[in-house]
């Protein structure tokens, strides 16, 4: 998730620009109704042959604007926290924390649309509706992801999947969805653990 990949352009024979624009508008309107969300997730990763190569579980949360929380609890623990300015990636096993500029880290992925509302970010992606799901594809050729599908049930995000350029697909099924509470807001504030190595990549880009 640290670096997400690729761009596959939609065929003009299948979708007109007007239809794509309308689908993007519908997705934006749906997301505008979700100022915050917290949920449990189960992750299933399959390869190009649809063989399961990994499963996992954890907790996921987001809040507008630009706040994100991801805590993988199994099989190996890891944590990603974005406070709107910085993004922190914590690997307890390696005792390492990587700090990145939020905009650079998130904007490379269609997942950015879940927390961004600005026109500039949305203009970087094509959106096509397929029943209760929306397929999002980056227009750039070096984005790091082929596509993301986000699906809703009665306006509530209930699953999404990420497809990379090697054909690997990560499916995330959500449960126990609810708006974040006042106490949950602490999730978006990363507390640096003691005795960990820190790789501050924000300094490298300055």
From Swiss-Prot:
GO terms for biological process: lipoprotein localization to outer membrane; lipoprotein transport. It comes from the Bacteria. GO terms for cellular component: outer membrane-bounded periplasmic space. Residues 1-21 form the signal peptide. InterPro entries: LolA/LolB/LppX (IPR029046), OM_lipoprot_carrier_LolA-like (IPR004564), OM_lipoprot_carrier_LolA_Pbac (IPR018323). It is found in: Periplasm. The keyword Ligase does not apply. Keywords: Chaperone, Periplasm, Protein transport, Signal, Transport. CDD domains: LolA. Its main location: periplasm. Monomer. Participates in the translocation of lipoproteins from the inner membrane to the outer membrane. Only forms a complex with a lipoprotein if the residue after the N-terminal Cys is not an aspartate (The Asp acts as a targeting signal to indicate that the lipoprotein should stay in the inner membrane). Belongs to the LolA family. This is Outer-membrane lipoprotein carrier protein. It comes from Shewanella sp. (strain ANA-3).
